[in-house]
Amino acid sequence: LYQGLFPNGLMQVTPDYFSQSYLLGDVNYQTVGLEDKGAIMETYSDLINSLDDKTNFQLTIFNQRVNLDKFRKSVLYPLHEDGYDTYREELNRIMENNLEAGENNFSAVKLISFGKSDQNPKLAYRSLSQIGEYFKSGFSEIDANFTLLSGESRVNHLADMLRGENHLPFTYQDLVRSGQTTKHFIAPTSLSFKHKNHIEMDDRLLQIVYVRDYGMELGDKFLRELMQSDLEVMISLHAKGAAKSEAMTKLRTKKTLMESQKIGEQQKMARSGVYLEKVSQVLESNIDEADELIKTMTQTGDKLFDTLFVIGVFAEDEDQLKHSLDIIKQVAGS
């Protein structure tokens, strides 16, 4: 829910909270050498750590099923009878084969959004634009496009997510003619919450799951494999940095509590005649991660972020939904 969406792309979520969204282009990460991969990861790290504790960060990846008929019209070469049709037919045949093999059936849209509180829309736009320009400059160093979304673009992307193909391209002229708000062009025609675990949204089902117990550093393997699983999913990673002193205090307190828990478990086992220096593998791993995180933050100045990692799974029916969830669990466990 939000209160307003301006043509310049600024969204007023509440009277004093605003957000901007940017479209992130592809980064040729898989095919570059180790040195270039290191530079890419360092750029990401520097950009994320530049955010203060008043700015919310959100990465959204929408793996959208492509309408094959529309896709064919947009990519296949028309024949012109000019002597080059043999080459066009060969290229068209290659693309048709890729479609049949399922290699081009999904398109991933990557969005980065920033949000923060401010006194009014003008100040919020200026503040958020400064953050966006800094990120744009950083991404340009690794040849990645980073484009501010206008209000119309944000509406159309949100409509793609929530309405699928059941919407026409939106323009602000439509508001003038219809007397409606941008929400009318985004919201599904029907929503049903009668099921415990999923939502009926027009002719689709949507279930939201969240990822927990992931490591201190979340690698790209999970996201990459999820994107390659031929599932229509919407991945959303929310993060907000904490002030360094507050984060260090929180980490040390958590480590102390875990060490106390470890001692308690050792004493409990000793009373039953068993003594082990190491106890629960998960607990030992969490203590080691806390140690490593404190060391890293002290040496590098990296920040600690509170994160929420959720996945929206779309399906045509309950059987397909169950199948998709099983695949996600397999990918998460690998």
Residue ranges of predicted features:
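Extended, folded cores of ATP/NTP-driven motor/assembly subunits in large transport
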Residues: 1-334
